[in-house]
Amino acid sequence: MSRYRGPRLKKIRRLGALPGLTRKTPKSGSNLKNKFHSGKKEQYRIRLQEKQKLRFHYGLTERQLLRYVHIAGKAKRSTGQVLLQLLEMRLDNILFRLGMASTIPGARQLVNHRHILVNGRIVNIPSFRCKPRDIITTKDNQRSKGLVQTLMASSDPGKLPKHLTIDTLEYKGLVNKILDRKWVGLKINELLVVEY
């Protein structure tokens, strides 16, 4: 299956708020779940919805998500915890969390158009896995800095997770450590995704 490029608000109404997909939030009165689906939820449906939340929030294809679940399953720690850490340490997600992009698809575009440097080298792969002590900057040209400047000025520094630090004057971000579970920006039960 390919990456989803359709109407984002339909997905938000069905699955709930997905901050990585769009800044908009669903209205409380327009909840499709309450209008059409009453009664008991089946376990399969609950697990599928959790998986779809994860997929649409991080902008993954089905194959990419399966690959991440497989890698997390090989780890000695909790599979769900490792899965979220792998997804949160992707370059496109870190740009979104730093406030350099308004959404994860916007961060993917910045990376694909070669505006981002990691440790002084151009990286054009959005799924690049960042490590602790990686320094993420924009290119030195005016166009790259201009794209990021307006977004960083409007972002809230209080929402910055503890595993990241940002220098707004130099348009530079630093990955301090691996993410803790409590700083994940999405309300999700990752164990249901692993079970699916």
From Swiss-Prot:
InterPro entries: Ribosomal_uS4 (IPR022801), Ribosomal_uS4_bac-type (IPR005709), Ribosomal_uS4_CS (IPR018079), Ribosomal_uS4_N (IPR001912), S4_RNA-bd (IPR002942), S4_RNA-bd_sf (IPR036986)
Record GO biological process: ribosomal small subunit biogenesis; translation
Secretion signal span: none
Residue ranges of domain S4 RNA-binding in the record: 89-169
Residue ranges crossing the lipid bilayer per the database entry: none
This protein's GO CC annotations: chloroplast; small ribosomal subunit
SMART domains: Ribosomal_S4, S4
Residue stretches in coiled coil: none
Keywords in alphabetical order: Chloroplast, Plastid, Ribonucleoprotein, Ribosomal protein, RNA-binding, rRNA-binding
GO molecular function, one term: rRNA binding
PROSITE patterns the UniProt entry points to: RIBOSOMAL_S4, S4
Predominant place of localization: plastid
UniProt cross-references to Pfam families, sorted A to Z: Ribosomal_S4 (PF00163), S4 (PF01479)
Intracellular or extracellular location(s): Plastid, Chloroplast
Function, in words: One of the primary rRNA binding proteins, it binds directly to 16S rRNA where it nucleates assembly of the body of the 30S subunit.
Binding partners and assembly: Part of the 30S ribosomal subunit. Contacts protein S5. The interaction surface between S4 and S5 is involved in control of translational fidelity.
Protein family: Belongs to the universal ribosomal protein uS4 family.
Protein name: Small ribosomal subunit protein uS4c
UniProt organism field: Festuca pratensis (Meadow fescue)
Gene expressing this chain: rps4
